[in-house]
Amino acid sequence: ELDTLDRVLVVGSFLRKDHPLMAQRLRQAAKRGTQISAIDTAGDDPLLKLTARATVLPTALAQTLAQVLVALAKTKGAEVPAALAGVQSDATAQQIAQSLAGGERVAVLLGNTAVNAPDATEIAALAQSIAQLSGGKLGFLTAGANTVGAYLAGAVPGQGGKSAAAMVAEPLKAYIVLHAEPLLDIDNG
């Protein structure tokens, strides 16, 4: 379905690290003209053209989504939810709202930072309201996406290969570990 979208809002995802396969698909979509906006916390280079971007503290994701929802409601001539009556939208929120309002096939995608935030339910509720108001769908970019993608791509031990647990249980002479912080990235439960 991603290939048919013309507007996408990605919230709380370090796309290249957390969801590299999705990042590639979004990169291709952007090349075809899909307008992609982001609300993120890292300010990293997504290696794709963004229509609008708000880089905020993780604690400000919900507030930023509230600003987008208010701007979108005003753009669409819809009623602003009473709970958000005092919310003022900044220029970036208005730019994101304008993009979403102009789309026919819209998706709001929540990444790892958004779904793991202490206020994840508020973030999800606001994102769902934005998706509904823009006539789109809400989606979740889950933490296991890389694992599933790697499996589907065949990046698993072949004949005679060993899993990470087997390599630790039966030590090898050498290990090559790239782009990993073993103490931070590996759950040895």
Where are these regions (language model features)?
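Cofactor-pocket helix-loop regions in the catalytic cores of large enzyme subunits
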Residues: 1-189
